[in-house]
């Protein structure tokens, strides 16, 4: 690390959520800096934020006040497909119809809300159906990544004659 930059006061992160180990390394290196994580999409802009991990470590942060969340097709655990409305949505794709401010943006994520915090469970195309039950690989991956000695984890689905699919764990 270039020690000339240790005087940073604010570090912003967006895109993928910082892993617990990376967040810890950043916090230890830049002890006086505020670490602000944003979650959003290109189409819907910012959806949630987490300042210095004040929100639950498993969430992507607190939902911005100007954001309206809709969860479509909720299951018994209140997990549903995340749809978003806010005043910062994009205007549309080139050569396609204009997107109006009241339009719901479909993120393609399965999520749930607890205490005004947004929790991502899985991408829509990553959900596994094992023995007619929804299984979200990200949930398993996050649990495994929090175990001592595990750096990375990935769960993939494999066809299975009895259950339809099974989860296969790969880790380092």
Predicted feature residues:
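Beta-strand->loop->alpha-helix junctions that form or flank phosphate-binding loops
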Residues: 35-42, 61-63, 156-158
């Amino acid at each position: 690390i270039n020690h000339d930059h240790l005087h940073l006061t604010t570090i912003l992160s967006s895109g993928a959520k910082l892993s617990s180990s990376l967040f810890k390394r950043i916090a230890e290196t830049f002890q006086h800096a505020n670490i602000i994580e944003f979650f959003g999409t290109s189409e819907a802009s910012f959806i949630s934020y987490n300042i210095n991990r004040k929100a639950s470590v498993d969430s992507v942060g607190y939902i911005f006040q100007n954001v309206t969340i809709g969860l479509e097709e909720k299951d018994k655990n209140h997990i549903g497909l995340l749809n978003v409305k806010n005043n910062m949505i994009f205007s549309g794709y080139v050569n396609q119809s204009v997107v109006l401010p009241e339009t719901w943006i479909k993120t393609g994520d399965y999520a749930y809300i607890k205490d005004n915090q947004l929790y991502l469970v899985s991408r829509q195309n990553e959900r596994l159906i094992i023995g007619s039950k929804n299984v979200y690989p990200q949930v398993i991956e996050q649990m495994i990544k929090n175990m001592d000695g595990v750096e990375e984890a990935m769960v993939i689905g494999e066809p299975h004659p009895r259950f339809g699919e099974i989860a296969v764990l790969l880790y380092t």
